[in-house]
Amino acid sequence: MKTPKLLLLLSFVALHLDAQAAASSLSQILFSSNRSSAWRLWLVNADGTELKQVTKQDTDDQDVDPMFSPDGKSVLFTSTRAGKTGVWRMSFDGSKPERLCDGDQAEWSPEGKRIALRRNERILTRDLAGGTEKTVSPEDWPHCSGPAWSPDGKSLAFAARWESGNAIFIVPVGGGKPVKVYDKQGACEPHWSPDGTRIVYETETHICTINPDGTKNRVITYFGGVQRYARFSPDGKSLVFCQGASEQGPWELYVIPATGGTPRKLTEGGSDMYPDWR
């Protein structure tokens, strides 16, 4: 019995679409590593394949804390290029680097037209087109760090020194009174899930997630060592983080389900930190 031509055509289309889906699911993780001596930006597929170096300047400058732009065409990062720590932007392939401003720990807004950053222990937003800046954290709050845009672009999560330790807060992007989310175990480095329903953060030793209203706090990494700098996957189902035997490292990247589970090693060799996932 011959297979009808229409069924053959439909089967071919289905296989083609499956192949496209498999290719598109191969997401990438951008991170900073000292495996080439100075800290440089590197890229690896989320399955651990195709590791490659992105920034390759022949200097002792340090490139850290990278973040993909929302459209994936540019990268925001902190660098000591030009002799002073600042926020830089470049094309995804490492070309066309440009210094944007003083500061560090910069993060794109969801629409890609603004950034949030830290400068002199304050949290600011900056318009990329005109350079207009606005201080978001209260002027009398010391030691603010780690700004992170909410997916709807209306709020920023950040950490601040609070009483005997750190605490995580959320503040409207336009300014206002910050609302405390969590203030125990040195909580810092907050980052939102893609749907805005969870925030991942780090304590002195582990990675946790929590609702933005401070409820349903959950420890994700129960194992030994120290875990830092966690970020959600684009679909919100996984987390990438760096793991070290101690605060001195060396650090390696791991991936774990966002609800906890068995971690999978992603990189090894040198120290790998500050991952961002697209």
Segments (PLM) and residue ranges:
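Bacterial N-terminal signal peptides that target proteins for export
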Residues: 1-7
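Bacterial N-terminal signal peptides
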Residues: 7-16
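Sequence signature of WD/YWTD-type beta-propeller architectures
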Residues: 20-278
